[in-house]
Amino acid sequence: MKALYRVLLLLAISLSVFSGCVTLRPATVDRKKDLSMFSRVYIPPTQTIHGSTAIVVSGMVLPYSQSVNPRDVIAGVLSKKGYIILNELDDRFRHETVIVNYGESNRRNFVLGYTIEVTLQFISASTGELVCTTTAEGCGSTEAADVKQAVTRALKALFK
């Protein structure tokens, strides 16, 4: 009987380690206006996020680090969707420009780690009105991976 408990305990630990993450909450989108009215995007600078972990290979522990700048992820996805990314706000294009603000809005802890929730806010450059917001969680091997996954999920939900 003692052996059965050990096997069940080992199985439970293995499953929790290999699953690595909790089920992520669905991404949400709140649309106030049509985003297709805009063709240009200005994304204010964001700070690079660094994350590190360790990987065990053949009994050796190897450090692994990763960094991501949320602005780069947002710009990559939006440029792929056909938006023109501006390095600065230009008065000539204000009526067709949307400003995208990034923010970490929550952190949810669970047994083996946490998720990071990000919110992206789309604001009209000409009127200052809120066009839409999108929020999503991310959970990866590092904080940088969490943020990258969350931003990607939020934008994917927006363009669904």
Where on the chain are the PLM-derived regions?
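A structural "domain/chain start" motif
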Residues: 19-81
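Sec-dependent bacterial lipoprotein signal peptides
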Residues: 1-21
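C-terminal alpha-helix
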Residues: 153-160
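Surface-exposed short loop/turn segments
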Residues: 26-27, 72-145, 149-152
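Residues embedded in well-ordered secondary-structure elements
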Residues: 10, 32, 109-111
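Structured loop/turn residues at beta-strand edges in well-structured enzyme cores
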Residues: 16, 36, 94-95
